[in-house]
């Protein structure tokens, strides 16, 4: 996963629509079968401070293959850590609230340069 990297990859995301999610209000878009590809980028802490996005595989995403995940309020979308996904700007004038939770396998290695951690953090 780009933002919650583990070795081996184990991140799963749960995205719950608190309101209907449509193309107009910024629903998620995803690449069918994209979870079968390699990780393309990784967000990590830089030595000396700050964070950076590094490229692991420079092959561009084929955005024309992405499909909208329009869902009704209460729907839970489960996202594999390697699945390319994004949302576009909300152009509707109404909100699109969602609740997201991510989980990783405690047996996977969570590198010390992952961006999400505190100096005393031990999540695994």
Where are these regions (language model features)?
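Short, P/G- and charge-enriched loop/turn segments at secondary-structure junctions
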Residues: 1-4, 64-66
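Sterically constrained small-residue positions within well-ordered secondary structures
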Residues: 5, 60-62, 92
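Double-stranded beta-helix
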Residues: 21-83
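Low-complexity, flexible helical/coil segments
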Residues: 11-19, 47-56, 66-67, 110-121
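Non-heme Fe(II)/2-oxoglutarate
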Residues: 43-45, 73-78, 82-124
